[in-house]
Design a protein with these regions (language model features):
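N-terminal accessory beta-strand-rich subdomains and adjacent acidic, glycine-rich linkers
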Residues: 49-301
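Gly-Asp-aromatic-enriched flexible segments
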Residues: 1-49
Length: 301
């Protein structure tokens, strides 16, 4: 055995479930295209949504003083290629074809476009193997995004693919018990919940993932969670997951600062159910990580 060359005599390869095969070094896996039936069904459902033009306008009111106009709705845009979830304060734009991917998150109150590049909707590690939840690959530059690039991008290999979506009203997720000293009267939250249904690649036939996005009325707040449905008849193990993977635009470019701790974070606040220690946000949230993007090579630091 020397370097990357080996001579094997009477070699025997053992494997589990999936038979190994020889492929080129750059092979990333088979890319499955969206079926015509699924494409027609999605186009028909998207065509029933109200159409908006992007970018959306900024609100003319201060939501902290008067937020009655901030109603969550689901729209279509870009000739039915995109689904837009917005309440007039924030918006999230999803490209649906050829696979689900968030292409923009906008703070409509400030006019900020929060994303500089397209990624995926998360990563599941099932039985030791990583699978992308939706996502588009092939972006030529990761410092910014042009909409014309999206039409040439392709799904990630071995990724979960969108096959359906539904829109519903937000329902209470916990039974909150109001106290006598609480000034706020108990009321149910209102808004829209957008749920995408994704199916696994061929090796995970029967495994589906529901991605839920809830946008509240009157609040610049989006909630996200997922469910896994296993109808394969066999056990699968969820080793780990990444619920959100966003290529955020940096709020500043300090060429002198070389330590990541010196960089300003994007203008976004992230919360999860996993809060620990003294519940001070910057140290309590152990699920939020700001990491370098190896794809982003056009920035000096």
């Amino acid at each position: 055995l020397s370097g990357d060359h080996a001579d094997w005599l009477e070699a025997v390869i053992t494997y589990f479930e999936i038979r190994p095969s020889l492929v080129a070094p750059e092979y990333q896996g088979e890319i499955a295209s969206m079926s015509k039936e699924v494409e027609r069904s999605l186009q028909q459902k998207i065509g029933q949504l109200e159409t908006v033009c992007l970018p959306l306008p900024s609100p003319s009111y201060d939501w902290l003083i008067c937020n009655q106009e901030a109603k969550a709705k689901v729209y279509q845009a870009n000739q039915g290629k995109d689904i837009v979830l917005s309440n007039g304060l924030v918006s999230r734009v999803f490209r649906i074809f050829p696979n689900l991917a968030t292409v923009d998150i906008q703070n409509l109150m400030t006019g900020e476009n929060m994303l500089r590049a397209v990624s995926n909707e998360g990563i599941l590690t099932l039985d030791g193997k990583n699978y992308s939840l939706g996502g588009l690959d092939g972006q030529p530059e990761f410092g910014y995004t042009q909409y014309k690039w999206l039409d040439r991008m392709e799904p990630f290999a071995n990724s979960f693919r969108v096959i359906d979506f539904r829109i519903s009203e937000i329902t209470p997720r916990i039974n909150w018990k109001s106290r006598r000293w609480a000034l706020e009267k108990k009321r149910n939250p209102s808004g829209k919940q957008l749920t995408f249904l994704l199916e696994g690649p061929d090796e995970l036939k029967g495994v589906k993932v529901k991605l839920h996005y809830a946008l509240y009325d009157g609040l610049p707040c989006i909630s996200k969670w997922f469910e896994i449905e296993n109808r394969t008849g066999a056990d699968i193990n969820l080793d780990s997951f990444v619920l959100e993977q966003l290529a955020m635009a940096e709020p500043e470019s300090p060429v002198e600062a070389k330590s990541p701790e010196m960089f300003r974070k994007p203008n976004i606040h992230v919360e999860s159910d996993w809060g620990f220690l003294g519940f001070i946000e910057k140290i309590a949230d152990k699920t939020e990580h700001w990491n370098p993007d190896p794809r982003y090579t056009s920035q000096c630091n």
